[in-house]
Swiss-Prot record:
Keywords: Nucleus, Ribonucleoprotein, Ribosome biogenesis, rRNA processing
Family named by the database record: Belongs to the UTP25 family.
Name of the gene: UTP25
Protein name: U3 small nucleolar RNA-associated protein 25
Species: Meyerozyma guilliermondii (strain ATCC 6260 / CBS 566 / DSM 6381 / JCM 1539 / NBRC 10279 / NRRL Y-324)
Its job: DEAD-box RNA helicase-like protein required for pre-18S rRNA processing, specifically at sites A0, A1, and A2.
Region (Disordered): 1-158
Localization, UniProt: Nucleus, Nucleolus
Main location: nucleus
Gene Ontology biological process terms in this record: maturation of SSU-rRNA from tricistronic rRNA transcript (SSU-rRNA, 5.8S rRNA, LSU-rRNA)
Basic and acidic residues bias (residue ranges): 45-61, 107-120
GO cellular component: nucleolus; small-subunit processome
Statement: the UniProt record of this protein carries the keyword Transferase: no
Pfam (any one): UTP25_NTPase-like
Length: 716
């Protein structure tokens, strides 16, 4: 935000022990004696699992038009709601998630809370410490009674190859057993092709003996395809066609979209997500009709084949989408609702009030910053979306949802509730499409939350949740769901943690596709700085990525620091940019205890008063050296004044940061505080920084810097 604090709203800087606020309604239904009313299950006698044989078609849980109350008296939480009509007691097996946190026991009296009225939404903000969780079973659905078994107007057309059936229904137990061994050991050679400005690399496990068929818009459900065709009449081509084909073939994908203005990929994965939900639902309804017909034949005494139809998971949710902010979630939900073609959209007004905002960062900030932090940048949310033939419901309970949209922070607070008895993760047991969008923003928040979500993804549930085991796919029962889970990762640029989501943490038998942007000396960020400034790249030796941090620190304290003042023409105005916060703390402690440098450090946890004071002292020369973290620059985008020499402890992950920091020297030159012939930039790097270097110097220069005979390279 602006240094003067003139911005209406600061982007949240989530700490690693983030305490957050939730938006909730205080309208909670209670009975006469003040106790919380318990919600009924509706058709409970048909939903409880009392045997493992096939149940009748009427107990099917994927359904049609809903007969629910509209949520006027619901407890509204940004996570989810349980909706029901009449209320009655239920036992513990009927408990399902209806809120984010359990921090107070239900037997404790309600504590007074501080309230902040939101006039537009009619809601109140309550600190999470005062939030009481209410675990109830999913809403009283009567969908199966009103839903036609097969939507005849929604059949696929021009589809010669059913990728959904091939990926989820056809794999046998023997095949999955072989696949579980091959995906962790041997993959076929990667094939590469160049499309537009990307190198597309495709890898498949050795067990995959069938080449994928090129798929396009024609293989998508008609109701989804019609919406797309109306909005995008021109034919999809190039990298977009390749990306859609990879999604529809259920391959795992890593796609750097390079620029914040590129948003079309979100249209594609939103369309893919709702298409998967509809195909799953129609597959179940068709099989239910077959089972019903077989039962009728049996009652008439006619012979029939007792065939199994395994088409379900342990729980209903099939798509999980992780996003960094509520504004990002708002945009994706709008896309999904658009492609669903739903005539009715429940709780849309509440959703808009809690997720949408017109706040924008000041125009003095870079465009990518303004895009990342526009609107509601709250990073604490979870939302369930449920779809029927004609309606869409927001804030559905997790166990009755088809799609779950959440921030990693919001979801992690559910998965690892402080009260172990009340932790919930069963709703993630049957996720088949896992999407991480704006991964670079999420990494800047706290990547540990993403790793936590992966820990619980496709984990065998603790409870049955009224599952019909005669319909559950065998690879779910055999704990092989990760083998078919599709992982889609979208980022502005790649980093090792982001890349690992597809390269090592995805074992999808459908294969994986990596899209790598082509950077050259002409389109790299260095070529766009517009400042003829000496830029020195200093390589240090590092034998492995695991030892890189230690080798970097030793090189810095043994080679860089001792010659820091002697190698520069200025004794002040030295800015040290440090990508890692942990390296920053280590360097700060070393310089304070083992050197006599006059320095200060500012980071993402510094108070506003310290940020202002140290930057002013740096300008005046009272502070000779200023340590500056990458995460602080991400959240604040300061234009540091008084910079005469720039030392980068590591290569910036975001190439735009390199350009912005170098221009800090340009600003000093313009103000005649520094001489362009005396100032310089020095970057420490190792061979393991090759990918980040490509974005700065270009793909043709990076290999030379990493493996050349010289250890120092200079550019102007």
């Amino acid at each position: 935000m602006q240094e003067s604090g003139a911005c209406r709203k600061k982007p949240a800087m989530p700490s690693r022990n983030a305490g957050s606020h939730l938006v909730v309604m205080k309208r909670i239904q209670r009975n006469g004696d003040g106790a919380m009313k318990r919600q009924k299950h509706g058709r409970r006698e048909l939903r409880e699992v009392k045997r493992t044989s096939r149940r009748s078609a009427k107990s099917e849980d994927f359904s049609g038009a809903e007969d629910e109350n509209n949520g006027e008296n619901e407890t509204e939480v940004a996570v989810n709601n349980s909706e029901s009509g009449e209320q009655e007691g239920v036992d513990d097996t009927g408990m399902a998630y209806n809120a984010l946190l359990t921090l107070l026991g239900s037997e404790k009296p309600e504590k007074p809370t501080k309230r902040r009225k939101n006039d537009e939404a009619g809601v109140e903000e309550i600190n999470e410490d005062d939030l009481e969780i209410h675990l109830t079973k999913s809403d009283d659905e009567s969908d199966e009674e009103n839903e036609p078994e097969v939507a005849s107007d929604d059949e696929e057309s021009d589809e010669k190859f059913n990728a959904f059936d091939f990926h989820f229904n056809q794999p046998s137990e023997d095949y999955m057993e072989k696949a579980s061994q091959s995906v962790t050991s041997k993959w076929n050679n990667t094939t590469k092709e160049t499309i537009d400005e990307y190198v597309v690399s495709t890898s498949t496990p050795s067990c995959m003996n069938k080449e994928s068929v090129k798929l396009g818009i024609s293989s998508i459900k008609k109701r989804v395809r019609d919406v797309y065709s109306e909005k995008h009449p021109s034919k999809i081509s190039g990298i977009d066609a390749s990306l859609l084909d990879s999604m529809l073939n259920y391959k795992s994908v890593l796609y750097p979209y390079k620029h914040y203005n590129n948003t079309f990929y979100r249209e594609l994965y939103s369309m893919h997500a709702i298409n998967h939900v509809f195909k799953t639902r129609d597959n179940i309804l068709k099989n239910t009709e077959k089972i019903k017909h077989a039962q009728e034949m049996a009652l008439e005494g006619k012979s029939h084949e007792d065939k199994e139809y395994r088409d379900q998971g342990f729980t209903r949710p099939k798509v999980l989408i992780l996003l960094p902010t509520r504004n990002a979630a708002y945009e994706v939900v709008e896309n999904i609702l658009k492609y669903s073609g739903s005539e009715q959209q429940e709780n849309k007004k509440k959703f808009k009030a809690q997720f949408n905002s017109n706040d924008v960062p000041p125009e003095t900030k870079p465009q990518d910053f303004r895009d990342a932090f526009k609107g509601n940048n709250n990073d604490f949310f979870c939302l369930g979306m449920k779809f029927t033939r004609k309606s869409a419901k927001l804030y559905s309970s997790f166990y009755s949802s088809d799609i779950i949209i959440a921030s990693p922070l919001g979801l992690s607070m559910i998965l690892e509730n402080p009260d172990k008895k009340k932790r919930q993760y069963d709703f993630l047991s049957s996720i088949e499409v896992f999407i991480v969008d704006r991964a670079t923003q999420i990494e800047a928040q706290n990547w540990a939350h993403v790793n936590l979500v992966l820990k619980y993804l496709n984990k065998v549930p603790k409870e049955f949740h009224d599952a019909d085991f005669s319909r559950i796919r065998m690879w779910y029962i055999n704990d092989q769901a990760p083998l078919v889970r599709q992982t889609l990762v979208f980022c502005e640029y790649t980093t090792p943690p982001i890349t690992s989501l597809v390269s090592s943490k995805s074992v999808n038998i459908g294969g994986r596709v990596r899209y790598k942007p082509i950077y050259t000396s002409k389109n790299c960020i260095m070529n766009s700085i517009g400042l003829r400034l000496k830029q020195i790249f200093q390589r240090f030796s590092s034998s492995s990525p695991m030892e890189d941090s230690e080798n970097r620190f030793k090189f810095f304290i043994n080679s860089m620091l001792p010659s820091l003042l002697s190698s520069t023409s200025y004794s002040d105005g030295i800015l040290v940019y440090i990508p890692s916060y942990f390296d920053y703390v280590r360097i700060k402690n070393y310089m304070r205890n083992s050197t006599k440098f006059t320095f200060e450090g500012i980071d993402e946890y510094s108070t506003q008063s310290k940020l202002t004071r140290y930057r002013q002292q740096f300008i005046s020369g009272k502070v000779k050296i200023l340590l500056y973290t990458e995460r602080l620059h991400y959240f604040r985008r300061f234009e540091i004044n008084g910079v005469k020499t720039l030392l980068m402890y590591g290569v910036p992950s975001n190439p735009l940061f390199y350009k912005e920091l170098v221009r800090c020297i340009g600003k000093s030159v313009f103000k005649e505080v520094a001489d362009i012939d005396l100032s310089f930039v020095k970057v420490m790097y190792s061979q393991w920084d090759a990918i980040a270097l490509e974005r700065i110097v270009g793909g043709d220069r990076a290999p030379v810097l990493c493996s050349g005979t010289n250890e120092m390279y200079e550019f102007r």
